[in-house]
């Protein structure tokens, strides 16, 4: 029983709410892309477009989310462009991860964030493939619950100029002006 309790403690993730500058998140994603794309045979271009805003969230979980999106994209060895852009939407920042190299039907996009045994195949021994979007969905759910403002969401849609986009929203850090200052 003690071992089970210790294992549960190790598996628990504590949500550490902090204020994170959006440019820092995107720079970390770009650095990660450069590191993992070295071994990819196809020529994939990754570009970022940021905003001068900060979000409220867990920096480690958000790095993991962006790394999952990059890993999933690079799993498909097709040349082309991937973009990560941001925009302000009221009290949220919308992150748009666009893979312009491949198309997905509306039906495929609707199923991305749900378990699918055909997609979740065993890659290397003991490692599941195709679970990246499920992990991203859980991270955004955690942010919706613990980041201090409800309304975080994640979804996928066809991209305007071809390909498809996964977008997610995080609460903007709204600076509070102190009275008398």
Regions found by a protein language model. Give the residues of each.
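Short, small-residue-biased leader/transition segments that mark boundaries at the very start
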Residues: 1-5
